[in-house]
Design a protein with these regions (language model features):
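N-terminal cap/lid segment of alpha/beta-hydrolase-fold proteins
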Residues: 1-18
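Conserved hydrolase catalytic core segment
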Residues: 109-119
Length: 119
């Protein structure tokens, strides 16, 4: 997860800053959270708009995630955990999503699943 350029991804859980607005970036199949496009998006957004944070994470079997099997339910769990983190730890009032490809598919499933509260 990445909240801004100044907070390394391994320290994000230890931070105490809150943000009114959080953008969750969900990448496509075969990609990962640290692509140049994601980094550029996060840097540009957080430098232009104050009180915004960007969270990027890896789906199962992608990037730094060590899992060997990809499943849609597990992806839904990952997204739910990230949304919950944005709401509780970062105290986000507004949560936005920037998605590509597979990430957009999971996000749309997340939004229409009745058992999961939408962003």
């Amino acid at each position: 997860m990445r909240t801004s350029r100044s907070v390394p991804p391994w320290n994000v859980a230890k931070q105490t800053r809150t943000f009114d607005n959080v953008v969750i970036v969900t990448h496509g199949f075969g990609s990962h959270k640290d692509t140049a496009g994601t980094v550029h998006f996060a840097e540009h957004l957080t430098s232009k708009y104050k009180n915004y944070a960007v969270i990027a994470f890896d789906w199962p079997c992608h990037g730094a995630d060590a899992r060997k099997k990809l499943s849609i339910p597990e992806c839904m769990t990952y997204l739910t955990l990230v949304v919950d983190y944005a709401r509780t730890e970062l105290q986000a009032q507004n949560i936005y999503n920037y998605s590509t490809s597979f990430g957009a598919y999971i996000t749309l499933r997340y939004l229409i699943e009745p058992a999961i509260r939408p962003v």
